[in-house]
Amino acid sequence: SRASLVEAISRIGSVWCVWSHLVQKRYYFRLQTSRPGPMAKSDSFFIRASCDIGNNNATEWNQTNIDLGAYVDALGKSVLRIHNIAVSITDADGASPDLLADKDGAAQFQISTQSQTGLVLATNKGLVASGMVNAEETSGADGVAGNVSESYDNLPQLWTNGYLVAVETMYLSGQASTGFKEAVTVSVVMECTVESMTKDAAMALALSQQ
């Protein structure tokens, strides 16, 4: 009868709606679970290092190692992201370094994933951070600078996502000019997190930084 036909069509429509809803829900669940999530990362922490860069750039090049072995393991897919670096250029006690009377002084530093024997350009693939301080003694007697300028022109905080490091050692190095009366010390404090990557990606990054 016509009524039976209408009822049958209605039941088929109901079954179709339920089946379609289940298929869409299953597809949405699969889509959500198949999307790659963000890389796991730690809370931020700080790594500190200092280097005596002397006061005779004609003959001195000084470098100190920064051990990252506790944080970086390319084979284990663990890498270090540096978010910020704070830099201090002082004497050995943390005070302003003295200059010779009426002399200028320049102090440069760099942090690199490769050991260096001198300053390198920002285009060097191993360079993580660099900067300089220029100072002038204006009183006519040995003492602290009357004029100072600084240029920290290459730091991780200048970049959108900081700087990712996959090597187990970085190198803090630098030099200072003879206008300084005493040896200059550069100290850095780096805000970092540890993140996970795929083994292949971590190894490729490590090789590119060596």
Regions found by a protein language model. Give the residues of each.
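Residues marking helix boundaries in flexible regions
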Residues: 10-13, 30
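Short hydrophobic targeting helices and cationic amphipathic motifs
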Residues: 22, 28-29
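Noncatalytic modules at the cell exterior or secretory-pathway interfaces
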Residues: 80-87, 162-180
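Extended, solvent-exposed segments with strong compositional bias
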Residues: 112-164
